């Protein structure tokens, strides 16, 4: 099992790095679209769409919409421009959705009676999770793209590394000190001590990146605000994890799929990032 997980992780990392460094913005966007479509396929089971044919139809319909959306933006993406007319609205939608998700998680299982048997509402949740995630990733990746193609890459990797490192910090802190359960009805393994460990990890990492980047990450933004945003982004990433756990628990599945050997499905790998990336993008570009 461990060998399988390690091999899968190596392949995943190689694929991500290849897409980040070698793909043009348009093809990078198409790769992201493929990830989103796989996420929708997995999400259809949360919406209690049990028949494979119905799941395939719904996924195909939404997948065509996503690819047409990205295709029509192809020239703008290659010019370093990302959904300029709709980006802020998409990210505001994401921030609002995660505010609602917090209420759903806190009140679970009582909240389930409002959404668990409503496929359309569940698919709306999927849209509010995955589409702003794609837009946020692209906006970060293409920041100052025409002047420096790697500036946005550094910014995007910062968010990814921040979330992944904080997740590791939370894991080890929870193992060592975890006593008080964070959300026992949703994810019994998570503790408040683990969350605090993750936030401390994020704080330390933010200082390190700011110091060694010579303020490239921050730009003309307030450093204190950037650090607060980094820590808040990690806090929101925990909500992304908890929200997917809630949907899986309600639908009676352990993993979103078995697509990635030893790691579960696509949603299992990006659940934290689907909350973190739009949240960070909105406040980084429109608030700070």
UniProtKB/Swiss-Prot annotation:
Keywords: Cell inner membrane, Cell membrane, Lipid biosynthesis, Lipid metabolism, Membrane, Nucleotidyltransferase, Phospholipid biosynthesis, Phospholipid metabolism, Transferase, Transmembrane, Transmembrane helix. Changing residue 81 to H: In strain: Eagan. Its main location: membrane. It is a multi-pass membrane protein. The chain crosses the membrane at residues 10-30, 52-72, 89-109, 118-138, 152-172, 192-212, 223-243. It catalyses: a 1,2-diacyl-sn-glycero-3-phosphate + CTP + H(+) = a CDP-1,2-diacyl-sn-glycerol + diphosphate. GO terms for molecular function: phosphatidate cytidylyltransferase activity. Pathway: Phospholipid metabolism; CDP-diacylglycerol biosynthesis; CDP-diacylglycerol from sn-glycerol 3-phosphate: step 3/3. PROSITE patterns: CDS. Its EC number is 2.7.7.41. This is Phosphatidate cytidylyltransferase. It comes from Haemophilus influenzae (strain ATCC 51907 / DSM 11121 / KW20 / Rd).
